[in-house]
Amino acid sequence: MIANYQQPGAAIDYTNSTGDTIKAGQVVSLTTRIGIAGTEIPAAAVGSLHVKGVFTMDKASGAIALGAAVYYNASTDKITTASSSAVPAGWAIAAAKSEDTTVQVCIG
């Protein structure tokens, strides 16, 4: 097989099929991972979705250790360490205390 280089892969073109506008910075579930909207993406339009990088995201209660695998819970719109009913998001690049409201996540 021959593989042809396409792009660095830090962002992808994403067709918004949600029926609603996706806001810039909004987390988008890609079933087995997440992306972050780089710009506002109107319904049925194509826009940029970051799939690599470090992002500060809202987190659920509870401490998160440096290096912990983290997940996106769409029902709460928060990052958690609980994998049940959640989408893999990446890993925590810094520890977050239980009382912290955000965590730094490396996606991709």
Where are these regions (language model features)?
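Surface-exposed, low-hydrophobicity beta-strand/loop segments enriched in small/polar/acidic residues
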Residues: M1-G108
